[in-house]
Amino acid sequence: MAIPTLNNYAMPSQWKANKVNWSLDPKRAALLIHDMQEYFTAFYGENSPLIAALTEQLAAVRKQCKALGIPVFYTAQPKDQSPEDRALLNDMWGSGLNKSPELQQVVAALRPEPDDT
């Protein structure tokens, strides 16, 4: 089974009030950009308004985090995964990036910078 084509949807324009009253402490925070690889975003189709909005917002969050000294980390699946390494992923999502290694890169606007991890 592979990931199906996914539908676009509107990003929220307003956020609900926070449930807690604490503030973010930049010295104890990190930003994780998870699986923003071309392989995954492609399931929303070319020129997806959702992916464009998401990428723009994530780029703004990353910029603010860097200004505050918050480290940025990325997850990204490798292009060559053995069936043993993929394990349950094969059962759920098929062969993944093994079929499309050219799509391994993180989307251009969010590619890791030299000081990212």
Feature names for model-found ranges:
Residues M1-D115:
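Active-site acidic carboxylates
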